[in-house]
A protein has these predicted regions:
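Ferredoxin-like iron-sulfur electron-transfer modules
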Residues: 1-20, 32-36
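Residue-level signal for mature regions of secreted extracellular proteins and peptides
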Residues: 11-17, 22, 174, 273, ...
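Generic internal hydrophobic packing segments that stabilize the cores of diverse globular domains
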Residues: 11-15, 26, 41-45
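Residues immediately within or flanking Cys/His clusters that coordinate Zn2+
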Residues: 15-21, 26, 178, 277, ...
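N-terminal low-complexity, Ser/Thr- and acidic-residue-enriched intrinsically disordered segments
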Residues: 25, 30-31, 67
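Short, non-ligating residues that shape and space the ligands of small metal-coordination modules
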Residues: 27, 35-38
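Iron-sulfur cluster-binding electron-transfer modules in prokaryotic oxidoreductases
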Residues: 39-379
Length: 379
């Protein structure tokens, strides 16, 4: 059946249930280039989301969920942070949140932290004093784009990243100032907000690149935003093209250093069996299975790679009307992890990892691969 056999009233359902994982374009659809039809389904859905946003705006809940910087700043304030985290763990209060904001009571919400990552690293001085070694692709010193998630919700992840990189003689600093990369607003269809965030981040990142720093971000979606989506939105912007070439996924960067013989491979602790979920927005960057290749350097470590979408998306798994669908999507991954019975499980995407934890239940949280690498180094 072609699209002409679908009721037009159902078009919006398709748009609503596409959360731009990009996997159809990368792994499923036979009509992508070089096919003459040149179908780019994710960006077709993005266009529909943008039109819908222009015409109708967004509901209050969705504006709140995608205002990650504003929510993060408020929720991470002293005293407020304790109240927010307690409320997120309270079944009665989550029930109220479900009835009022339509945020599903069973969806795991990320914790907030005080101090934030940027507060903790405000006066950071790199622990490595070794001479910087430049390779064909890397400058050997890295400015961390913390991301709103790394700053407010998962500072320990970013701190682990700093430890691992400095253990490999890579000086680290923070990007001087940053806003959310824009991915939440992008998926909402609010492209004007994406453009505003891009202008702020572009100047900040170019400042670091001009000073000889590479850029690394701990969240795949944020890296993808700068590598793919913003350059596609603004193809004539030379600064964004420069950023695209100088921003890296953490394990992509570590692999490039390893290829040049510069990775520390003196590991102190085996990791055993690791159920590793390959994040969608990392896979579509097309730089290979670098996380797997680096972790497999650790002796007595076996990786079981799972390449399926977790169904989280940042907001899809949280919203009342789509949470149950998201849990159906993650179910095959959960069953695979249960069958493996690993020593550790996790994903490069911390939000996807939360979805795995929600599906598995229990008290054993996921571990990010960069945190596993820190453990393997004995740091």
């Amino acid at each position: 059946m072609g699209v002409d056999g679908i009721d037009k009233a159902d078009y919006k359902k398709v748009v609503e249930h596409c959360y731009l994982c990009d996997l159809c374009y990368m792994t499923k659809c036979p009509y992508v280039p070089p096919h003459e039809w040149n179908v780019d389904f994710p960006h077709l859905m993005l266009r529909a989301k943008a039109v819908r946003f222009k015409q109708s705006g967004a509901r209050f809940r969705d504006r709140v969920l995608t205002n990650t910087d504003q929510v993060g700043r408020l929720a991470s304030l002293p005293v407020v942070v304790n109240a927010v985290n307690a409320a997120n763990r309270s079944a009665p209060l989550r029930g109220v949140l479900e009835k009022t904001l339509k945020i599903h009571a069973n969806a795991k919400l990320p914790p907030y932290h005080n101090p934030t990552l940027r507060q903790q690293l405000r006066n950071h001085e790199s622990s490595t004093t070794d001479a910087i070694e430049i390779t064909d692709r890397t400058q050997g010193k890295v400015a961390l784009f913390a991301t709103c998630y790394g700053n407010y919700n998962a500072p320990d992840l970013a701190l682990d990243l700093v430890q691992v990189f400095e253990h490999n003689h890579i000086p680290m600093t923070l990007v001087r100032t940053e806003q959310c990369c824009g991915m939440p607003k992008f998926e909402l269809g609010d492209l004007d907000a994406v453009a505003r965030a891009s202008e702020h981040n572009r100047d900040s990142l170019i400042e670091m690149i001009d000073a000889g720093w590479d850029i690394v971000a701990p969240v795949p979606s944020c890296v993808l935003m700068f590598k793919q989506e913003l350059p596609l939105m603004f193809p004539n912007n030379a600064d964004l093209q420069r950023i695209r070439k100088r921003i890296f996924d953490p394990f992509e960067y570590l692999y490039l250093r390893h290829r040049a013989g510069l990775l520390n491979v003196e590991f102190k602790h085996p990791l055993g069996t690791v159920a590793y979920h390959a994040a969608c927005h990392q896979r579509v960057q097309n730089f290979g299975s670098r996380t797997k290749q680096i972790l497999e350097l650790v002796p007595e470590t076996k990786l079981v790679t799972i390449e399926r979408c977790s169904g989280h998306d940042g907001t899809y798994a949280v919203k009342l009307e789509t949470h149950n669908a998201s849990m159906k999507i993650v179910r095959p991954i959960v069953k695979r992890i249960q069958a493996v019975a690993p020593d550790h499980y996790g994903s490069d995407c911390p939000i996807a990892a939360t979805q795995l934890w929600n599906g598995l239940g229990g008290d054993t949280p996921p571990r990010h691969p960069i945190s596993l690498l820190r453990i393997a180094y004995g740091l």
